[in-house]
Amino acid sequence: MGSEINDNTIEFDVLKNKEDLTKEILNEVYNSLKEKGYNPINQLVGYLISGDPTYITNYNGARALVRKLERDEILEEVLKSYLGIK
C-alpha cells in the first residue's frame, strides 16, 4: 500500500530554479534595505554597477545573500523580467 513505486520521471529545470533563487534573494535584500531605511533600488543599482558589496546592508544577512549571485546573472534576470522574456 505505502510502497508503491512511481515510474514517472521528474524533470528538474535548472533555469527555472535559478530564476526563482534570484528573485527570492533580490526580494530578501530589497526588504532588508527598506527595513533599515535605505532606498533599496538606489542601493541595488550602486551594487550592480560598482560591485561594491558595502552598498548592501549586513542586516538579515542581505550582503551575504546577494553575493551568492553573480552580478551579470542578476542583470540578466532583471532584464528578462522587464522585457517579459522567459
From Swiss-Prot:
InterPro entries: IreB. It comes from the Bacteria. Belongs to the UPF0297 family. PANTHER family: UPF0297 PROTEIN YRZL (PTHR40067:SF1). This is UPF0297 protein CA_C1679. The lineage of its organism: Bacteria, Bacillati, Bacillota, Clostridia, Eubacteriales.
